Amino acid sequence: MSADVIQSLLELSHQLGGERLRMVILGEGNTSVRLDDDTFAVKASGSNLASLKVSDVTQCAFSRLLPLLDTTAATDVEVDQALLAARVDPASKKPSIEALFHAYLLTLPGVRCVGHVHAIAVNQILCSPRAREFAEKRACPDEIVMCGLESVFVSYAEPGLGLSQAIRREVVSFVKRTGRDPKIILLQNHGIIAVGSSPKAVLGSLLMVEKPPRSLSVPPPWVVRSS
């Protein structure tokens, strides 16, 4: 694995995992970077973003995970076996279960980095009746620049294969409907995914999507339930 690329992944992970940003707690969240046409590096299962080390990053083969997204059904055991088989180094740690959607998102045009967090300010909205409207609206011009005109919205699904398939389905639908590639994907009752050309771009998008709900003392109108 390229030392510089992995170092940039570690730096992003430490920033996202830090207490100041309040984007994750304990083992929440994960990050990944594309290494080349065949492989990517992703946070290992059971590791912590704030303290992520090189040994907590697992290199995986796209070809061993992407076909799983086309299966109509797979048991938890089969998914675990696929995750273990995807490791380039069999001695490395098992990749996160969410490596499945990282593998897909890293194949999108221009995407070389993915960050997934459970930001408290945003999750307050994603766990509300106005979650979908939050994905469709923007509160300030900078949010449009960093996060796009709207976000992909994914209805709640249990983490694992089902969620990864739902993400792919909604991204494909979004691109077809808007003609644009997404920057932010919002997962109902779960969290945020940012995709970008670099760790810096991903960090910027995640900071910006959290800005409106964090800075406004009065929630935007799409958060407040109509009477």
Model-derived features with residue positions:
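Glycine-rich flexible loops
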Residues: 1-227
